[in-house]
Amino acid sequence: AIDDTRFVPAKGRNRIGSMVEGRPDWVLSRQRAWGVPITLFVDRKTGQYLNDPLVNDRIVAAAKEAGVDAWSDARAQEYLGDSYNAADYERITDILDVWFDSGCTHAFVLESGRWPALVRHDGGTHSADLYLEGSDQHRGWFQSSLLESCGTRGQAPYKAVLTHGFTMDAKGFKMSKSLGNTISPIDLMRDYGADILRLWALSVDFTEDHRIGKEILAGVADQYRKLRNTFRYLLGALDGFNDEERITDVAAMPELERYMLSLLADLDAKLRQAVDDFDYNAYTRLLADFCNEDLSAFYFDIRKDVLYCDLGPAAPLGTDTRRAYRSVLDVLFHALVRYAAPVLVFTSEEVWGTRYPDAGSVHLLEWPDLDRLVFPREGGDPELASADSALGSRLRGNTQLVEKWAQIRSTRALVTERIEPLRREKTIRSSLEAEVWLPNEAGDVDYEEIFITSTVHQGDWDVKRTENHKCGRCWRHLPEVTADGALCNRCETVLDAQ
């Protein structure tokens, strides 16, 4: 049974295995005044236990009515009935080992009849998907449950066992009232909010002992603010977005949008795997890194010019690039709010309710089906979505595109690094004033847009202050701008309603 069980972390298998192998016989009785009584009568002359179904039925009925206190000398004759004399029998006053009590939970929980899906075709009951407790329970609940279930059911009561470490103070000491280092979760929630406490719990390696303190939570609070800012940006950038503006032909989208959808599909697959592996530390890290590095520091930064400046009288729905950007933002919103919901419970509800005040709770939504988010007009019953579709298969697998943009991002980082000295020296105030020379300029990439700079040329590495004039609308320094304050070609086109 141990070999058939999944253990998280894997070392739990050897731990419980060695304990079971070396344990002595289990004596189930305990001589205690309080507990679940062993309801047996013993013949005073022969020392034999009385095994009479009618007697047992009367004891069970009394226990259902009055609880375990019904097992008393005063009611002994009532249970024995007319067939036996109470004076001839000793009522056992021992109780069951409390670990036997806990080890029976699978029987009265899983086999309670409340979950029909757990019932097998042969009338038996499937094991629980997961038992979750502290690492000390390899000697306790996990082991007693295993022994009791194997002895009576012939199988482990669980498919997987997950053990967690314990929470220490900021210095790594065990919390104790005598040391005065205890921390109340209620106080933490009052000071930081429940979502920050949840984010901390899911960010640590819970399989080991972990620390908590004000400085640690301050770092988590900073991470939370970055995630919250991602949703704040999405809500603002999607204001007024509708189906008329939506673009569903991904092939017609700019390469940057296709790249971001591919990254999202890759994130989706990794998050699914993290959940399957109970690796919530990886889950929160992947989510935070995507929001901070791929979105805020890259995608949002590049496309803010398009968002603000590609809308005007001549383009009431926005340019095709702006429409593609907002279409991708909508997909990102629907995916990310679902990804964040198990972690940032209240924030996700707030975000969802802000955009869709009449749509019910975000926690009633299922895991996002990326293909159906991206291609909503292609119809079909969402309940019939294939497994491949659910994995966003149509958005993944473009290795060439991902590798190309990984190189572009690497070059972008180098350009940003070379611009910083000019900014510190106040030679330029913004990257928009920088003119860049690259040794290997690809012809199909709008480097000015990606780097958020003025003109980009092919040549030896160099960054200088541009002599181009500044567009009065988008603030980009471009060759076609005739004087500071005049308009660039793009802005003239967008504003020309004739």
Which role fits each region the language model picked out?
Residues 386-398:
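Short Gly/Ser/Thr- and charged-rich N-terminal loops/segments
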Residues 47-60, 415, 423-469:
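A broadly conserved sequence feature marking short terminus-proximal activation segments
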Residues 1-239, 260-303, 307, 327-340, ...:
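Structured secondary-structure scaffolds
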Residues 91, 480-483, 497-498:
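Short, non-ligating residues that shape and space the ligands of small metal-coordination modules
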Residues 39, 467-470, 484-487:
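Short metal-coordination and nucleic-acid-contact micro-motifs, chiefly zinc-binding Cys/His arrays
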Residues 42, 89, 241-272, 300-378, ...:
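Acidic, turn-prone loop/beta-hairpin segments
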Residues 217-244, 342-354, 433-458:
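Structured, non-catalytic alpha/beta "coupling" segments that mediate domain-domain communication
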Residues 475-478, 489-492:
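Cys/His-coordinated zinc-binding microdomains
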